[in-house]
From Swiss-Prot:
Its EC number is 1.1.1.86. One of its GO terms (biological process) is L-valine biosynthetic process. It comes from Roseiflexus castenholzii (strain DSM 13941 / HLO8). Belongs to the ketol-acid reductoisomerase family. One of its GO terms (cellular component) is cytosol. Involved in the biosynthesis of branched-chain amino acids (BCAA). Catalyzes an alkyl-migration followed by a ketol-acid reduction of (S)-2-acetolactate (S2AL) to yield (R)-2,3-dihydroxy-isovalerate. In the isomerase reaction, S2AL is rearranged via a Mg-dependent methyl migration to produce 3-hydroxy-3-methyl-2-ketobutyrate (HMKB). In the reductase reaction, this 2-ketoacid undergoes a metal-dependent reduction by NADPH to yield (R)-2,3-dihydroxy-isovalerate. This is Ketol-acid reductoisomerase (NADP(+)). Gene3D superfamilies: 6.10.240.10, NAD(P)-binding Rossmann-like Domain (3.40.50.720). NCBIfam families: ilvC, PRK05479.1, PRK13403.1. It comes from the Bacteria.
């Protein structure tokens, strides 16, 4: 069983007298900076000159500095940046200031696991990864709670890397819920696998294939959208609250019977073998190598995939149907806009 740490395992006083630089002010960065500040920590935010987030962070009472200055001033540096941006920013602005005795922290292990960032000896390297989007990390903290998190140590130069990481997690509010000890490799590999096989790749492909099957069989696209896309949230919410058993308790007996009889026909031995190959590509670094090369080349395939899927009929039908349902708080992505 995993080691799980709570409030009594974490001493926030370990952060006293130390400045924490949160590099980035996006989804995770803003939550980290504000939660730590309200937990009594000395926090600065590191941003590039001209960042749209600069005035926003200052407006929330945070001290903002250029990235290099923030890294120089701080004793603890948290990289709360997109994976693809971290290596260059670390090389140019952060690495030169990672002197012995400092701590370099991550909210995701990609760049350490795949060797894109190699910290110097004498520096603690750890990770605190809240298991929720930044807005949720912030919201739950302000309500007096916390979201679970993962904690890991890659390099323990001081002998106190885990204790300091747990103190940081307490500053975020995560020890109120529980912090699970892991490794950079486990966090990174399972995170990528979950995204590819279930949360993004698997679900997206399943929804599109089911929608296409119904439409090709002559059913109306609008009805197919409701059955294959819209109602998915109803089921996922049940998973979220009580797992598979609660979902089956909540749906009709007919739906439950279909679950048992049809599900194994969708997830076949061949599908499981494919999952294992995907995991092997993640573990070997093949996926990371491909993704890093894609970014170096200007993302031609990535952009082509995005353009292709924006034009899928399920997106066109969904856009129209969501206008009928303002209560779902519809969102529309403008072509060319990026995500995280």
């Amino acid at each position: 069983m995993a080691n799980i740490y709570y409030e009594n395992h974490a001493d926030l006083a370990r952060l006293a007298g130390r400045t924490i630089a949160v590099i980035g002010f996006g989804s995770q960065g803003h939550a980290h900076a504000l939660n730590l500040k309200e937990s009594g920590c000395d926090v600065i935010v590191g941003l590039y000159q001209g960042s749209k987030s600069w005035s926003k962070a200052e407006g929330l009472g945070l001290k903002v500095l250029p990235v290099a200055e923030a890294a120089k001033e701080a004793q603890i540096v948290m990289l709360a940046l997109p994976d693809t941006a971290q290596a260059a920013i670390y090389r140019d602005a952060i690495g030169p200031h990672m002197t012995p005795g400092k701590t370099l922290m991550f909210a995701h292990g990609f760049n350490i696991r795949f060797g894109q960032i190699v910290p110097p000896e004498g520096v603690d390297v750890s990770m605190v990864a809240p298991k929720a989007p930044g807005h949720r990390v912030r919201e739950v903290y302000t309500q007096g709670g916390g979201v679970p998190a993962l904690v890991a140590v890659h390099q323990d130069a001081s002998g106190n890397a885990l204790a300091d990481a747990l103190a940081y997690a307490r500053g975020l509010g995560c020890t109120r819920a529980g912090v699970i000890e892991t490794t950079f490799a486990e966090e990174t590999e399972t995170d990528l696998f979950g995204e590819q096989v279930v949360l993004c790749g698997g679900v997206s492909a399943l929804v599109k294939a089911a929608f296409e099957t119904l439409v090709e069989a002559g059913y109306q696209p609008e009805v197919a959208y409701f059955e294959c896309m819209h109602e998915l949230k109803l089921i996922v919410d049940l998973f979220y609250q009580g797992g598979l058993n609660y979902m089956r308790y909540s749906v009709s007996d007919t739906a439950e019977w279909g679950d048992y009889t049809a599900g194994p026909k969708i997830i076949t031995d061949e599908t499981r073998a494919t999952m294992k190959r995907i995991l092997a590509d993640i573990q070997s670094g093949a996926f990371a190598e491909d993704w890093i090369e894609e970014n170096h080349n200007g993302r031609p395939r990535f952009n082509a995939y995005r353009t292709r899927d924006i034009a899928h009929p399920i997106e066109q039908v969904g856009r129209e149907l969501r206008r009928m349902m303002p209560f779902v708080n519809p969102r529309e992505v403008v072509p060319g806009e990026g995500g995280a």
